[in-house]
Amino acid sequence: MLVLIKRVKTKYLLLEQKKFQNKSKNICEVYQSESFRCIMSLSYRITFLCVDDTMVAKTGTRFENVSKLFDHAAHNGSNYLNGHCFVNIMLCIPVWKNDRVSYLSLPLGYRMWQKKESKLELAASMIRQVMPEFQEKKQAIILCDSWYTKQNLGSIVDEYQNLDLIGNARIDSVMYDPAPAHTGRRGRPAKHGKRLSVETDFAFSNEKIGDYYIGAHRVITNLFGCREIQAYVTATEKEHGTKRLFFSTIFPEDLQIFCACQEKEPLNQTGSDRMKYIPLFLYSFQWNIETSYYEQKTIWSLCSYMVRSCKGIEMLVNLINICYCAMKILPYQDEQFSEYRTKSVQEFRFELSQGIRSQIFLTNFVRNIETHIKSNVIIKALKQLIRQQVY
């Protein structure tokens, strides 16, 4: 027991050292570059950058930067928790599976929100950090919920020609018709048309698409300056149903080639009248980040850290994330593990750990035999067994 305690203490002391923090930072950079290498073979496909944040509850008070946080998704009787908030960016990369394009979700990293800058500014800086990894011809789309669909993050789209944004927005966001054509009369031309309402100015589809009626309209909104964008409104019922608003800086006609080889409906229905709703359907990739949070928190011990400093916590959380993503990337990087592409990350981790454990056991066993027992027959048999394990 004392040996185990010493090992745990050594692990956490190591995370506080600057040398280890620098090495961990290099590991994170290598992981990010490897993630982007996976998408170069499908460079004509769109890549998604999902932005969100998650909270980790901590009962102790000695953790650096621990504070009271509002949790809108809490179901324990209180909307507040004591803990840390992490902003995360997830990369959804296209991969071939069963002669179709499927998307693999890889969280790129976590940054702790320390309240020195807003979560919007933190997310924008993380996106600026990864954008140079994209080739100029590689299209990227930011996916985010209504908390992040604001001007701080929306303005970053204008900084890169190959970057767009699809996001849920506040239902009371101000929208206008596009500016009318110039009449030739004297005076300054109008910047926009009349103000639009989600209640009266969106014509809904005749039938439900999935669980919702959908209305589409080209609009101008202050969130994206004078840029014309596509707006969508979804409703459970045409008259009195709950409505949600979405904005997209990319238009359906720009996604025609992307949809042709998609694995799932309705993304592959390019010839139907649903094509105009494709940007809205793409928002479904945003839910992959919630699945990632659930897996990392419940199975990969993302919330179990005992490091006290902010830097140490960030390093540990990101190292756990790298281990998680390595299990996702490896079946696509090494054909030897290709059978695990359709299996869960946890199942692949178990199988891989079993193989590593058996090889370590056999190697140590052979080393001890060579030291203490001089039996050529046993040594040859065990070496042959090790070769079979490797190949």
Model regions and ranges:
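Short, N-terminal intrinsically disordered low-complexity segments that are rich in Pro/Gly
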Residues: 1-2, 282
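Active-site-proximal, Lys/Arg-enriched surface segment
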Residues: 16-100, 108, 212-221
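Single, function-defining residue in the core of a domain
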Residues: 42-44, 58-62, 96-391
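Non-heme di-metal
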Residues: 9-10, 18-22, 26, 242-244, ...
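Short, basic interhelical loop/turn and adjoining N-cap
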Residues: 2-15
